[in-house]
């Protein structure tokens, strides 16, 4: 009787461990795909022009023109330098 219970316990462990590993793999894959997706949506400064500047209240304001893009905005230039710049997307 103890031998049967031991065998059942081992079989249960063999079943549970691979399924939990697969779940971890799925979560890792989702994270990787999400990172790739948002990286693709990054704003571009190429093809953008306009007058974008920081106001006294600290916010970036101005007019931007993005030829060949569907979305254009004036905002912080985080990666390049401290200040404001026009960014395009789409």
Swiss-Prot record:
The keyword Transmembrane does not apply. Keywords: Amidation, Disulfide bond, Neurotoxin, Secreted, Signal, Toxin. One of its GO terms (cellular component) is extracellular region. GO terms for molecular function: toxin activity. Residues 1-21 form the signal peptide. The modification Glutamine amide is found at residue 89. It comes from the Eukaryota. Expressed by the venom duct. It is found in: Secreted. Residues 22-46 form a propeptide. Contains 5 disulfide bonds. Belongs to the conotoxin S superfamily. The cysteine framework is VIII (C-C-C-C-C-C-C-C-C-C). This is Conotoxin Ca8.2. It comes from Conus caracteristicus (Characteristic cone).
